[in-house]
Amino acid sequence: MTKREKRVVILADTQTHMMPALAREMARRNHNLVLGDARDGLADELIKLGAKVEVVPDTADQTKEDTIQKLVDRAVDAFGGFDSACIRTGTHGIGTIMDSTNEDCRIQYEGNFRSVFYALKALLPPLVEQKSGQIVINTSAAGARVQEWFALYGATRAGANELIHAAGLEAAPHGVTVNGTGTYAMNYPSFLHDVGADTDPAKLKAVTDQLPMRKLCEPEEAAYFVATLIDGHGTFQTAQFFPIDGGWSFM
């Protein structure tokens, strides 16, 4: 157990997706924060919520071995360490095996698998040493339902989910939990663009009609769920993958 006046959470990246909402939720849950590449104005919002905030720039490229280590180092320098982390990883891509190139394979492997390995290598040692901590790596629900039209993306996400599973088992005897989450159909610009819904509302309906929940996931919904895995209260579930996808991965 640690003796910091407040729990400290590392979040990366906090530009988009559920991550700005997660930062706000963690501040509400009485955490100080170390942020990778924060959205403009986000740090000021968090300070108004009572949090101390450290922003580490130039941490967008998680295929670099030292990217997440920079966040760990800042947490140690500013707060004496950290208690939990959520890292959003990934490089999107579509294509069948026959349509994909060797370069496509390299990009997907580095963005979706190696980035997770680097994150775990940076985050696990200090938490194992202090005998407590929680890690969530956000991958994608695509890893739980690989389809032929996103073969490399789904396969590398699936591999990352299994790496997280192994990390959870490795860290469990040391009081550290490691879990994965994966979203699908989130209401944010990149997803809307990927499905063409940013220019054609009919395409959005085509997506939601295929979901058991018949709606998109709001970033705040996903953030609230993930916050529960890293706020220090629920510390028994580990080595799990939790899809946040409205039931899509079970269809």
Which residues are covered by each model-predicted region?
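C-terminal substrate-recognition "lid" of short-chain dehydrogenase/reductases
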Residues: F117, K215-I244, S249-F250
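Substrate-binding pocket helix/loop in short-chain dehydrogenase/reductase
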Residues: T96-I97, T101-Y109, G196, K203, ...
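Residue(s) in the substrate-gating loop at a strand-loop-helix junction
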Residues: S140
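Active-site helix of classical SDR
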Residues: L120, T156-R157
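Short, small/polar-rich loop/turn modules that mediate ligand/substrate recognition or access, typified
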Residues: A172, T177, Q237-A239
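Alpha-helical segment proximal to the catalytic Tyr-Lys
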Residues: P125, L169-E170, T235
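Canonical Rossmann dinucleotide-binding motif of NAD(H)/NADP(H)-dependent dehydrogenases/reductases
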Residues: T2-V34
